[in-house]
Regions:
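Short helix/loop segments within enzyme catalytic domains
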Residues: 16, 20-57
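Charge-dense, low-complexity intrinsically disordered segments
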Residues: 11, 15, 35, 68
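Surface-exposed, polar/charged faces of alpha-helical domains
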Residues: 4-8, 34-35, 39, 72
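Post-HEXXH active-site segment of zinc metalloproteases
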Residues: 1-18
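Pan-zinc metallopeptidase signature
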Residues: 52-101
Length: 101
């Protein structure tokens, strides 16, 4: 049971790191707007949704198991990317201080 708890805790920390990376990617995207083509932002949000753990597990024919997630849900990934994009502020990407992911 202890080893399982450690794995669940490690997964939860990994989710926070991955969502922070999504947010930082959003900041990058907002700073290179002149280099992006029309539709790139929507494509990035769609990609974030497609690589959410819940989506990937469903695609594999399984019921999503949140305790096994290592990247966050589709909704979380898109929301944190958008948060970085809209704010442009690294301080808004602190997933470890966030009460809600």
């Amino acid at each position: 049971a202890r080893q399982q708890a450690s794995k669940v805790e490690a997964n939860a920390l990994t989710v926070r790191l991955e969502l922070m990376a999504d947010c930082l990617s959003g900041i990058w995207a907002t700073n290179v707007q002149g280099l992006m083509e029309k539709g790139d932002l929507q494509e990035a949000l769609n990609a974030a949704r497609k690589i959410g753990d819940d989506h990937l597990q469903r695609q594999a024919g399984r019921v999503p198991q949140p305790h096994t997630f290592t990247h966050g849900t589709s909704e979380q990934r898109a929301r944190w990317f958008a948060r970085g994009y809209e704010s442009g502020d690294v301080g808004q990407c602190d997933t470890f201080a966030a009460a809600r992911l």
